[in-house]
A protein has these predicted regions:
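Basic/aromatic-rich interaction segments and small domains that mediate binding to polyanionic partners
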Residues: 2-5, 13-66
Length: 66
């Protein structure tokens, strides 16, 4: 199921802390990283303090931890 940016913004908020379990199509360097959501872009990808790659909610595995 694809979510709209508005639906994602109701689920995920700037300032929330997440832990990445696995980013689809990437190696394991981001697995286990934690960070704070700093921005949700126009297509709903999450950007934050965990590194330079955006988290894609439909593809990547992560949990909100705070």
């Amino acid at each position: 199921m694809h979510q709209t940016k508005q639906q994602r913004e109701s689920l995920y908020k700037v300032g929330q802390r997440i832990r990445i379990i696995h980013m689809e199509g990437e190696d394991t360097r981001y697995d286990g990283k934690e960070g704070v959501i700093e921005h949700i872009d126009g297509i709903g990808q999450l950007h934050g303090t965990w590194g330079s790659l955006a988290v894609i909610p439909e593809a990547d595995k992560f949990i909100v931890i705070g």
